Amino acid sequence: MRSKYIVIEGLEGAGKTTARNVVVETLEQLGIRDMVFTREPGGTQLAEKLRSLVLDIKSVGDEVITDKAEVLMFYAARVQLVETVIKPALANGTWVIGDRHDLSTQAYQGGGRGIDQHMLATLRDAVLGDFRPDLTLYLDVTPEVGLKRARARGELDRIEQESFDFFNRTRARYLELAAQDKSIHTIDATQPLEAVMDAIRTTVTNWVKELDA
């Protein structure tokens, strides 16, 4: 079985870190042990600097980051990560487990920010070509639940401080995109933790078994 790229998506407070741990545990039980982990934005020295610029509310002082500048910084970080980390890992037979990928931009910037979705799709295709995750787990929570969890973790970053309306639009776009793409599996992350973990285990196990079929 060739290596695969699995991405975990969701609003702030959806439980992506816990989900990643469950994915890793499940893959190991299935005999898959050669894995690397990525996060977006970030994952390389350059991409981490871009992450700081786009997420740290104090990174550019009083200067307002425009919506299109934000998108371009996300894509600069993403293509650097894909070309220097993700693709080489996959080529070497290593599975890649990612905390966010392009679906975040389509949902947050296309839904939350209201940036033209055709422009985003064109930009994605120009930068990434036909490169896509093999499996995406979208952890669905309401903004009320997710932001309550995020606030309990401590200080919020620039995007986490957006309004409930922003996150409602983002969630709606996530759900819309998930309904259009069979590689995106939606997990109800408002359930009790054990139920969420069981749903992730079942989804990943069944998906891997289908690869072997």
From Swiss-Prot:
Q: Which PROSITE patterns match?
A: THYMIDYLATE_KINASE
Family stated for the protein in its record: Belongs to the thymidylate kinase family.
Q: Which positions carry the signal peptide feature in this UniProt record?
A: none
Keyword Cell cycle on this protein?
A: no
Q: Which UniProt keywords apply?
A: ATP-binding, Kinase, Nucleotide biosynthesis, Nucleotide-binding, Transferase
Q: What is the protein named? A: Thymidylate kinase
Q: Which SUPFAM superfamilies match?
A: P-loop containing nucleoside triphosphate hydrolases
Identify which top EC class this enzyme belongs to. Answer: transferase
Q: Which PANTHER family match?
A: THYMIDYLATE KINASE, UMP-CMP KINASE 2, MITOCHONDRIAL
Q: Can you state which reaction this protein catalyses?
A: dTMP + ATP = dTDP + ADP
Q: What does this protein do?
A: Phosphorylation of dTMP to form dTDP in both de novo and salvage pathways of dTTP synthesis.
- Its Enzyme Commission number? 2.7.4.9
Q: Which residues bind ATP?
A: 10-17
Any GO BP: dTDP biosynthetic process
Q: Which GO terms describe its cellular component?
A: cytosol
Q: A Gene Ontology molecular-function term?
A: ATP binding
Provide the species name.
Answer: Escherichia coli O127:H6 (strain E2348/69 / EPEC)
**Taxonomically, which superkingdom?**
Bacteria
Identify the InterPro entries for this entry: P-loop_NTPase, Thymidylate_kin-like_dom, Thymidylate_kin_CS, Thymidylate_kinase
- Identify the gene encoding this protein: tmk
